[in-house]
UniProtKB/Swiss-Prot annotation:
This is N-(5'-phosphoribosyl)anthranilate isomerase. It is an enzyme of class 5 (isomerase). Keywords: Amino-acid biosynthesis, Aromatic amino acid biosynthesis, Isomerase, Tryptophan biosynthesis. It comes from Bacillus velezensis (strain DSM 23117 / BGSC 10A6 / LMG 26770 / FZB42). GO terms for biological process: L-tryptophan biosynthetic process. Its EC number is 5.3.1.24. GO terms for molecular function: phosphoribosylanthranilate isomerase activity. Pathway: Amino-acid biosynthesis; L-tryptophan biosynthesis; L-tryptophan from chorismate: step 3/5.
């Protein structure tokens, strides 16, 4: 089994940033929208200046203007823009020529998810599939039925897109998710303790993931 790409999202302090930068993650996610994990572009800029890392940086936006997204992506040299609101395929198409970043669209798991993936395919580089919880955009800590993960993975791979699975992923559930062979995993609350990223949880998650991958080749 190929090791999935990993994104640690909701980084909200220099300490979080340092832990994630030293981890085995591929992507570090920053939320620029209303959330308990919200940060400012200025904060992220300071962390980037003080901590050297080769991790890719993802900015998460919710119903933000195209102009503001493009400006923040340019100022921070974001590797990825994640559209996590009610953005349309047309919004993603309008954003494309304004940025150098990859564009991902977050979609909620449901009956229409595969159709939405197809609709966004011409305009984005990847997807984040998350649980559908009324009144919440993400960071719920609640998993959806991972039996559908192979369908999402296949559709994304056929279109040459990245696909991350989010919602309810933590050290206790990671093995169950890996059985579905996701190509990407996205975590926020699953590696937090008392609202902060936790080194012990990160280490435990990565140990279990690496072990499963090593015995599944």
């Amino acid at each position: 089994m190929k090791k999935p790409e990993v994104k640690y999202c909701g980084i909200r302090s220099k300490r979080d940033y340092e832990l994630a930068a030293a981890s085995g993650a591929d992507y570090l996610g920053f939320i620029f929208a209303a959330s308990k994990r919200r940060v400012t572009p200025g904060e992220v800029r300071k962390w980037k200046e003080k901590v050297l890392t080769d991790k890719k940086h993802v900015g998460v936006f919710v119903n933000e203007t195209i102009e503001n997204i493009a400006q923040i992506a340019s100022d921070l040299a974001l590797d990825v823009i994640q559209l996590h609101g009610d953005e349309s395929p047309e919004d993603a198409r309008r954003l494309r020529p304004l940025v150098r970043s990859e564009i991902w669209k977050a979609l909620h798991h449901g009956e229409g998810t595969l159709r939405q993936m197809a609709q966004f395919a011409p305009a984005v580089d990847g997807y984040v599939i998350d649980s559908s919880v009324k009144g919440m955009r993400g960071g719920t800590g609640i998993a959806f039925s991972w039996a559908r993960v192979p369908l999402y993975r296949k559709q994304a791979q056929n279109a040459n897109k990245r696909c991350f699975i989010a919602g309810g992923v933590n050290p206790e559930t990671i093995t169950g998710l890996l059985r579905s062979r996701p190509c990407g995993i996205d975590l926020a609350s699953g590696i937090e303790k008392n609202g902060q990223k936790d080194q012990t949880l990160i280490r435990l998650l990565e140990e279990r993931m690496n072990h499963y991958v090593s015995i599944s080749k």
